[in-house]
């Protein structure tokens, strides 16, 4: 720094070569010194710049951290605002729906009120009509009161008529009871009649069977009689040889061919039995 302000007069240059050499050395030394000073100045300037940059970097780092924190806060605030916006939107839509439903309900109520207004007019006309009808009925009631006052002396006859009506009602009830009994009896008789028809059909079938058996027995009896009449008369000697055995066989003393007579009697007894059986069944059915 001191070499920069030094001044060398021009007369000293021409003194001698030694002085020139010395001067050149001094100049070179001054130049080197100036270079070192310049380098030192540059280094100092760069150091200051670096220090300033470091300070700026620290400030920027602090500002970056602050901005980052502010950004996080802003993000959280934005999320909260978004949630609030969603809630507000949902609430708004719900309110809109509610308002719409209320509008529909109020419109329906308005229509109902319009209908009620028409019904109210009809009711008013009906009330007026009923008022006129009431007046007419009051007039008729007054007329009826007059007629009842006129008919009051005949109240004894009305009581007798009421008694006769009650008697007639009792007779009608008895007639209805008799009619119900007649219906039940008719149904029971119809049931018994159907049972009787079934029994008669069964008896007719049995009679047909018995008649067939009787015809068969009569045929057999006639065949037995014919066989007995066609048989030869035994000789006296043969009868004597057999003695009482012949009487035992033919029943003795004029009762010849007892088997044929017995068969005929059996047929007659069966016929009478069948007729009695049919009669008894018919009597039981009619009684039942």
UniProtKB/Swiss-Prot annotation:
One Gene Ontology CC term in the entry: nucleus
Predominant subcellular localization, coarse grouping: cytoplasm
Q: What is the effect of changing residue 176 to K?
A: In flx-3; early flowering
Q: Give the tissue specificity.
A: Expressed in roots and leaves. Expressed in shoot and root apical meristems and vascular tissues.
- The residues forming a coiled coil are 38-94, 132-231
Q: What happens when the gene is disrupted?
A: Early flowering. Decreased level of H3K4me3 and histone H3 and H4 acetylation in the region spanning the transcription-translation start site of FLC, but not of UFC or DFC.
Keyword RNA-binding applies: no
Biological process terms in GO annotation: cell differentiation; flower development
- Give its localization: Cytoplasm; Nucleus
Q: Where is this region: Disordered?
A: 225-257
Q: Which UniProt keywords apply?
A: Activator, Coiled coil, Cytoplasm, Developmental protein, Differentiation, Flowering, Nucleus, Transcription, Transcription regulation
The UniProt family comment states:
Belongs to the FLX family.
Say what the protein does.
Transactivator required for FRIGIDA-mediated activation of FLC and for the expression of the repressors of flowering AGL27/MAF1 and AGL31/MAF2. Does not alter expression of known activators of FLC expression. Not required for the photoperiod response or for the vernalization response. Not redundant with FLXL4.
Instruction: Report quaternary structure and partners.
Output: Homodimer. Component of the transcription activator complex FRI-C composed of FRI, FRL1, SUF4, FLX and FES1. Interacts with FES1 and (via N-terminus) with FRI (via C-terminus). Interacts with SWC6, TAF14B and RIN1, three components of the SWR1 chromatin-remodeling complex.
Q: What is this protein called?
A: Protein FLC EXPRESSOR
